[in-house]
Amino acid sequence: MAKKGALTGLLLFGIFFGAGNLIFPPSLGALSGEHFLPAIAGFVFSGVGIAVLTLIIGTLNPKGYIYEISTKIAPWFATLYLSVLYLSIGPFFAIPRTATTAYEVGISPLLSDANKGLGLIVFTLLYFAAAYLISLNPSKILDRIGRVLTPVFAILIVILVVLGAFKYGGTSPQAASAAYQASAFGTGFLEGYNTLDALASVAFSVIAVQTLKQLGFSSKKEYISTIWVVGIVVALAFSALYIGLGFLGNHFPVPAEAMKGGTPGVYILSQATQEIFGSTAQLFLAAMVTVTCFTTTVGLIVSTAEFFNGRFPQISYKVYATVFTLIGFAIANLGLSAIIKYSIPVLVILYPITIAIVMIVIVNKFVALSKPGMQLTIAVVTAIAIASVLGSSFKVEFLANLVNVLPFAKASLPWLVPAIVGILLSLVLPNKQESDVFEMD
């Protein structure tokens, strides 16, 4: 049980941990200053806690989120929501973003300006070709990522963090930004959303279930116990690296110019690597970032292709993997800024819906909930999320004003209280539904 859980946990940690997970903790460390401890606590609580909880809930029932959403909300909504989610964190946004980030942080500094355009094409071609070849045989993903690539990038990050702690641990933190001075834990909590790992947890729960099935279980009790081991392994690995990278950022001397953009993480990683490793710095950084991003890319190709093949089996897994890899390759060559610009509104809509679904599933594990009440809750949260994006990103003023009167709107959580009210109503509305008790195949 422990071995199965540890192996699956390492696989999922390797797939989850991408470039964003490298950049955000040192940024938080630099910006939080003397308020680092409550800030990193908030970051770990949201960036690790919500993601791991979403993952555990998705794997406690081997039928996965597609079944949970279909039975609690509606089959058509499950298909629509999960299709948009997988396409967003898959070929249209996250897959190309991992490749472009790996290139811009790790490879681009090694090239002259004249060769950077061609360099991106060549790098992404080789990058996606390798990811595609591994993804063609998803049954081998545990061996190829969990046992090989994950230890490689984890060791590289640990080396940087440990050497950085010895070199800069005695340096005093800089003054905290206004946001962290006002609410260190709250700001850190909201920064944890930037990892978007709660969305990825929905997708990667498919890989978790498939991997666990391959390992085989003699009873439901063993399966459930192993899932908790998986969650503990993922949580501990994430927390340790987040705290280490945050500590590095907290003590690394960052000039005022680098702090102005509000995200000094890239600067800290680059400069700390150069100062620690000297002439070999860029090669070390290139290896660390590329391997980190690559594991995420493979996991996203596999999980997205498996979802669509399971939902629309008329098309083979191989065709889906091929198409999604080609789309990722094409979009990656648009550049990182373009990918981030177009992805943010979609992800901001998906995140509240995902958390609301997880809240419903958790509560329903313990008490019966009204199906109309659950449907109403998701409908209201979806409407608020869409209104928030239209109001903030597309400047629809009357929608922005409506959203801003809701509790916690200033904390970017206008949907939270309506979601809680909806779940409370589901306790008293008719047509109650018990959570299904799954049986092992």
Where are these regions (language model features)?
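Membrane-water interface regions at transmembrane-helix termini and the short interhelical loops
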Residues: 60-64, 68, 127-149, 214-217, ...
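TM-loop-TM module centered on a large, flexible mid-protein loop between adjacent transmembrane helices
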Residues: 65-71, 241-294, 345
